[in-house]
Amino acid sequence: MAEPASAETFLLIDGENIDATLGGNLLGRRPAPEERPRWDRVRDHARDVWDQPVRGLFFLNGSSHLPMPFVQAIAALDFRPVPLSGPPEVKVVDIAIQRTLEALSTRGSGDVLLASHDGDFASQVAALVRAPGRRVGLLGFRELMSGALTELTAEGLELHDLEDDVRAFTVALPRIRVIPIERFDPWALLG
């Protein structure tokens, strides 16, 4: 049976968090262009995972500078750039994503994929996960996701690793993570 015409996935990208996690936690420096996620792959994964159209919203902090070439590239990939501004002490991207998640909860329809590691969204994500008939997923690096978010997997939150599941990168990232024994390959160590 086909999905209703109104079925769609809302893909919310916390651009600041993904970039900071990649640079600060994994690379220890600003990522080079070839080390950044391929956002078209993220969009395609979001479409394919639940086999329905995707509405991509890419949240950016534009308080001090808006990288127009990047914004134009994101728009060309069918994301809607959401540049935000505010005082330096205000986490404008977090506030906007929280409000969007709350609005989606009130809306009552639409599946949600959130690309972030930030536990500040836990209460809004929990409300969506607990809503009947709604699918909710988190995109990021599993080992760096907030425990406040990952504990929601017991209630149905799906985790999608940006490197392993989404294949959003064209280079291998220097990650240290637990390897499920069924995926352990000694040849990867022996090279």
Predicted region positions:
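Nuclease catalytic cores that cleave nucleic-acid phosphodiester bonds
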Residues: S64-G191
